[in-house]
């Protein structure tokens, strides 16, 4: 199983960062590896979303079920995709009204060795760079 743990301190509120990460339908606008993204179902405290990976010749879709705690966290669990396991958590800790700590923790494993050999290196690059992509997007949207 692969584990990714990343965090960053940003000059934006926890609510702003939560809204950015929770806006799955906009992912293709700023994530370079995203071929498409869509929210399938959404309530105040949950969602189901699919993301298409299109990177370095790899084209795969994965779907997650997400528990939402607005302004605080998003817990992700795999519904479908090339993984035997995928769990993750985005957390947003308010430091003051204009700053927060954002954390991404991902645990994933692939459905078989062949899939892991093909997709593993690509998904690791994607997962490693994901937090940076959201921080960059926040700068574009929220910088004054």
Feature map (PLM): residue ranges:
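Residue-level preference for beta-strand/loop junctions
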Residues: 2, 45-47, 58-60, 84, ...
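Short, highly charged C-terminal tails/helix-capping segments
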Residues: 136-144
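Hydrophobic ligand-binding cavity/cleft-lining segments
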Residues: 1-45, 144
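Hydrophobic pocket/interface hotspot
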Residues: 17, 27, 49, 66, ...
